[in-house]
C-alpha cells in the first residue's frame, strides 16, 4: 500500500478523534509542531529510523521530546514507531490539515511576491480569494520570490492564480503567436 494512502488513514483517524473531542485546531498545531521538528532535525529522523535502536527507546525519546503534545498525538507517534511508519509523519500532518481545512471551509494559500507583504495586503488577498474560491477564509503564507518582476502568484491547493508580470507577458506572447 502506498505511503499516501496509509498517511491518509492515520490522518482520518486523528481527525475523527479531534472532531469528537472538539480539538481540531489544537491537533493541527501539535501536528505542525511535530512535523516541523521531525523534518528540520536530521538527527531526530536518523534516530527514529535506526533499526538497531529498540522501539521502547524510541518511544521514551519521543515522550521526552514531545511530552507537551496531547496523548492522542503521542499515541499516534508510538503506533508509527511500532508499525515502522514514522517516515510518513510529514504526510500525515499534511493530510490532517487538508481534512481540518475542509471541515472549517478554509483554504491555505501560498502567495509568492517580490517582497514581504504587509498584513493589510495579506488580508485583502485573503478576502478576494475567499470570495473567488467559495471558502469562508483563506490563510495566507507569504513567500518572497525574487525571480518575479512584479505582481503576485497565489497557490491554493493545486490551483495557481498567476498575476505576476512574467505570467502576463507569457499570456501576451501566446496571444501574439496565436494571431500570427
Curated annotation (Swiss-Prot):
What domain of life does the UniProt record list for this protein's source?
Answer: Bacteria
Sorted UniProt keywords: ATP synthesis, Cell membrane, CF(1), Hydrogen ion transport, Ion transport, Membrane, Transport
Which Gene3D superfamilies has this protein been placed in? N-terminal domain of the delta subunit of the F1F0-ATP synthase (1.10.520.20)
Q: Does the keyword Hydrolase apply?
A: no
GO terms, molecular function: proton-transporting ATP synthase activity, rotational mechanism
Compartment list = Cell membrane
Kindly list any coiled-coil regions of this protein: none
Q: Does the keyword Membrane apply?
A: yes
Which NCBIfam families does this one have?
ATP_synt_delta, PRK05758.2-2, PRK05758.2-4
Entry similarity comment: Belongs to the ATPase delta chain family.
Assembly mode: F-type ATPases have 2 components, F(1) - the catalytic core - and F(0) - the membrane proton channel. F(1) has five subunits: alpha(3), beta(3), gamma(1), delta(1), epsilon(1). F(0) has three main subunits: a(1), b(2) and c(10-14). The alpha and beta chains form an alternating ring which encloses part of the gamma chain. F(1) is attached to F(0) by a central stalk formed by the gamma and epsilon chains, while a peripheral stalk is formed by the delta and b chains.
Stated role = F(1)F(0) ATP synthase produces ATP from ADP in the presence of a proton or sodium gradient. F-type ATPases consist of two structural domains, F(1) containing the extramembraneous catalytic core and F(0) containing the membrane proton channel, linked together by a central stalk and a peripheral stalk. During catalysis, ATP synthesis in the catalytic domain of F(1) is coupled via a rotary mechanism of the central stalk subunits to proton translocation. This protein is part of the stalk that links CF(0) to CF(1). It either transmits conformational changes from CF(0) to CF(1) or is implicated in proton conduction.
Could you tell me what this protein is called? ATP synthase subunit delta
